[in-house]
Amino acid sequence: LWHLQPVVAQVQKTSTSAKQIKIGVSIWSSTDVLGSQSKKMLDAAGKALNVKLVYVDQGHESAAVTDSISTLAAAGCDGIIICNSADSEMTSAINTCNSAHIYLAQFYRTINKVASPQVYSLAKTAPYYIGAVHEDEVTNGYTLANMLIKKGDRHIDLEGWVAGDATFISRWQGYKKAVSEWNAAHASDKVIMSAPQYAGTTAEQGAAVANSFMNSDSKMDALIVAGGGGDPLVGSVGAIKSAGKTGKIHVVSTDFLPDLGKQLTTGGMTGESGGHYADPLYAFMMVYNAAKGNYKKPANGYDEIVNPYIYVSSTKDYDKYAKYFVSEFPYNDKELKAMANDTLPELKKQAAAISVKDVESRHSVK
């Protein structure tokens, strides 16, 4: 299984081998586009491995994020996976889990060691913080911004969700990198990108931000909706349609819409990154193995699993994605049970390989 028997397992409250394992999930929303996909994938894993899952929705509000860990600890969880907002929230989360002897892993997030050195140092030495599953967000941002630039868009407005969110900051770095590279090479054809306006995690706020940009920027020809779970994008796309500007304002985003195929056809969307809802599954597997006593935390460190994005910019792309990621899960019941016995290097390899082609090769009838 995962390495040798851990030292920290000796200080667990009770043995988990004879009872059902309980894993808590601290998530911004378990009902929006990305959150509901994440929950379905986790529920499938819980069912396959007889794990009880407890969800707390915290809306990416800092006080609610830290409170969610206390709530899940009080519920008797053996492990917790968390999609926090700011790195600073992880100090409280890590300390709570250490005190309660509960294993903790992040999903869709990792601690920025440059921006948050104290939190990073705490995470490395904390016996119950075991790691993070996340994406290469700078490359994600860079790829999406270049989709717009290559379409000829030069006045790009930026919609974030929460100021200071670690993932948004990384995506923003990527957007800025694409813009600065283009501008350095095209002095007479520069791209202007706005400062971000923040839409939280609701469709109403997404619509309000899009309307604000359309009213204040007469040259606006593109909108980046950085994320927020999918609902802000629904609102923004709806506002652009109501203004009669569908196809005139090009939109890219992260977190796939349920009707992405239609939006690509009508011009409501230009391109999107997503398909990464298996990310929390890998955090689940890390915590599950730790609770089973099959994990040893590295000395002065922790483990990270990097999950790639899938990029879609045509209906042909989306049709294949829909077949293998919407109509079914990227991992079936048999594969989920097998993953529970995989080593960490094996899980890292599986995560790095996930793509439409990967799922197609595993699930197509031979």
Where do the language-model regions lie?
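Short, low-complexity disordered leader/linker segments with a strong preference
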Residues: 1-22, 95-100, 359-366
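Extracytoplasmic "Venus flytrap"
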Residues: 15-41, 45-49, 54-67, 75, ...
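An alpha-beta-alpha
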Residues: 23, 27-29, 42, 130-186, ...
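Structural recognition of the beta-strand scaffold that forms the well-ordered cores
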Residues: 23-26, 35, 54-56, 79-83, ...
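Short beta-strand elements in bilobed, periplasmic/extracellular small-molecule ligand-binding domains
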Residues: 47-58, 157, 180-203
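Hydrophobic alpha-helical
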Residues: 80, 85-99, 175, 198-262, ...
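Flexible loop/hinge segments that line or gate small-molecule binding clefts
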Residues: 95-139, 260-261
